[in-house]
């Protein structure tokens, strides 16, 4: 035992309030225990009560040691065993009930704490990154520190607002909504999209059936590596994912071995073998390696919607809403039935025009841009057939934009009901159509931001038919008064078209290309001529004769 008396001991601890006259007797007894006789039981209990009252009033920081030093001289001076038990009971009651500065939880609460945290980690091997409320990928586990507040009985702090003070079963209190290990994609926790459409990239997904696992798979190719995502639990082949990042084998295997949730596949086709990891971890790795955009739309959460419509879900909703507002504000778009009719009769009309009219381009000219542009409804350009078939369906949002930007003014001139080419009323219709197209382009630039680079030539620059817009429209206007004379000339000279055919074949390829750019709209007029026969055929014949005159 130390030789310091109790008031000095308190002063050493920074507590100057205990120098009371009642305390000095206890101090004398403890400082000089040999000189005093054994005290009575009432005196000892008085001392203990006084010391407990003063300590509770002051709350000195080291009261546990203070009580032990007070208890030891009493034991040395011959107190009875009952007094020692009373002292120990008071020590226990005091330590855990009135001492609220450090808040040691009771033994039962510590047991509950470990019961709640440890089995949770055992029963749920899924790392805490994929858990409900954690968006960032490197956060601490969310469930661990909660039970100390919810179950420790003597602690003075109020429990958290979402929890009760009653002890709760472990699996309920730590995780309010435990996610199953099988489904590694939490649509409610993180962002609803997962990945937006990067500029300049169109979605390319292959859907395959994995027979062994009996699930669908979504396969995206990048850097000559096919990365696969399962449809049932959204796990992704991490081996192939890191191969896209061109990572070395050692680093790749080290990263995948450290994953807590992984599924190793050793049997099957090449793109299915490897270590499969959860969706969130794969997304984190892809973001770290900066390969997310290359793998679009693998990380779009609602990837089925992308496959059906061809656009990211919230982007599709935004484009549909913007298109609805634009159509209500400006002139109505061209009606879909003539477009569908043009697609059905496109091949026959082009074959007829290639045999009858020498100025048109044959449909067999393959994949060149000029022939693709010659028939807006021709079956050679896949984008237009999809757009024409999906014209009345809301899923056609993705492809309609390509149509209206590639062939804007032809649709305005030839498809507008009640407007012929040779009437001057086509010009105000084309201006309203220009406004509509500008709005469409602005929306496209807002949504995607890249199509202006690819399709600049719609209405603004007209790079597809530059000479047509500058020269051919004045030809229509100037040739209109002489229509009857030109018809007579055509009747007198039926062989002009054959001569123009021979001239075109004799001219070099560059000249033929420029003429084909001039004459490509006439093919369209002929395809539309299958719907509205009489005026467009006259117009095609007139324009053919004028071009033949120019060549002479």
Curated annotation (Swiss-Prot):
Residues 238-259 bind DNA. Residues 121-151, 419-434, 516-546 have a biased composition (Polar residues). SUPFAM superfamilies: DNA-binding domain of Mlu1-box binding protein MBP1. It is found in: Nucleus. It comes from the Eukaryota. Keywords: DNA-binding, Nucleus, Transcription, Transcription regulation. Residues 340-381, 435-447, 478-504 have a biased composition (Low complexity). GO terms for cellular component: nucleus. InterPro entries: EFG1/Phd1/StuA, HTH_APSES_sf, KilA/APSES_HTH, Tscrpt_reg_HTH_APSES-type. One of its GO terms (molecular function) is DNA-binding transcription factor activity. Residues 204-310 form the HTH APSES-type domain. Pfam families: KilA-N (PF04383). Its main location: nucleus. Residues 17-48, 70-93, 121-180, 327-384, 410-447, 478-552 are annotated as: Disordered. GO terms for biological process: positive regulation of transcription by RNA polymerase II. Putative transcription factor that stimulates pseudohyphal morphogenesis. Belongs to the EFG1/PHD1/stuA family. This is Enhanced filamentous growth protein. It comes from Candida albicans. The lineage of its organism: Eukaryota, Fungi, Dikarya, Ascomycota, Saccharomycotina.
């Amino acid at each position: 035992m130390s030789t310091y008396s109790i008031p000095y001991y308190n002063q050493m601890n920074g507590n100057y309030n205990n120098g009371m006259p009642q305390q000095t007797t206890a101090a004398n007894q403890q400082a000089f225990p040999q000189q005093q006789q054994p005290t009575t039981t009432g005196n000892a209990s008085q001392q203990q009560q006084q010391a407990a009252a003063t300590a509770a009033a002051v709350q000195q920081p080291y009261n546990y040691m203070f009580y032990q030093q007070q208890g030891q001289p009493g034991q040395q001076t011959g107190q009875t065993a009952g007094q020692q038990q009373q002292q120990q009971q008071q020590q226990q009651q005091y330590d855990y009930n009135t001492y609220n500065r450090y808040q040691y939880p009771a033994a039962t609460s510590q047991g509950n704490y470990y019961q709640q945290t440890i089995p949770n980690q055992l029963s749920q091997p899924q790392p805490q990154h994929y858990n409900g409320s954690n968006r960032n990928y490197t956060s601490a586990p969310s469930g661990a520190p909660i039970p100390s507040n919810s179950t420790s009985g003597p602690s003075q702090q109020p429990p958290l607002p979402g929890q009760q003070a009653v002890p709760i079963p472990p699996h309920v209190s730590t995780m309010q909504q435990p996610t199953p290990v099988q489904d590694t994609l939490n649509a409610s926790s993180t962002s609803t999209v997962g990945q937006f459409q990067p500029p300049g990239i169109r979605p390319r997904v292959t859907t395959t059936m994995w027979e062994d696992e009996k699930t669908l798979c979504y396969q995206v190719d990048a850097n000559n590596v096919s990365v696969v995502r399962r449809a049932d639990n959204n796990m992704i082949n991490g081996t192939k994912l890191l191969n896209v990042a061109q990572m070395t084998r050692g680093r790749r295997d080290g990263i995948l071995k450290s994953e807590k949730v992984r599924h190793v596949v050793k049997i099957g086709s090449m793109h299915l073998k490897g270590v499969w990891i959860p969706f969130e971890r794969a997304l984190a790795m892809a973001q770290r390696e900066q390969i997310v955009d290359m793998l679009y739309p693998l990380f779009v959460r609602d990837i089925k919607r992308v496959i059906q419509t061809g656009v990211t879900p919230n982007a599709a909703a935004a484009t549909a809403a913007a298109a609805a507002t634009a159509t209500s504000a400006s002139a109505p778009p061209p009606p879909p039935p003539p477009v569908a009719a043009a697609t059905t009769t496109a091949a026959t009309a082009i074959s007829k025009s290639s045999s009858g009219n020498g100025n048109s381009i044959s449909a067999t000219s393959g994949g060149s841009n000029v022939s693709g542009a010659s028939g807006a409804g021709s079956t050679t350009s896949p984008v237009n057939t999809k757009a024409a078939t999906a014209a009345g369906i809301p899923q056609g949002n993705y492809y309609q934009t390509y149509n209206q930007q590639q062939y804007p003014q032809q649709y305005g001139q030839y498809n507008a009901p009640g407007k012929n080419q040779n009437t001057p009323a086509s010009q105000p219709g084309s201006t309203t159509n220009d406004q509509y197209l500008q709005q469409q382009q602005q929306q496209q630039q807002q949504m995607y931001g890249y199509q202006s680079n690819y399709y600049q030539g719609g209405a603004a620059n007209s790079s597809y038919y530059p000479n047509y817009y500058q020269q051919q429209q004045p030809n229509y206007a100037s040739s209109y008064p002489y229509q009857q004379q030109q018809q007579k000339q055509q009747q007198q000279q039926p062989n002009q078209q054959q001569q123009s055919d021979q001239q075109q074949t004799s001219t070099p390829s560059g000249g033929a290309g420029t003429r084909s750019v001039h004459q490509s709209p006439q093919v369209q007029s002929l395809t539309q001529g299958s719907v509205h026969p009489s005026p467009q055929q006259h117009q095609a014949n007139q324009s053919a004769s004028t071009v033949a005159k120019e060549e002479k």
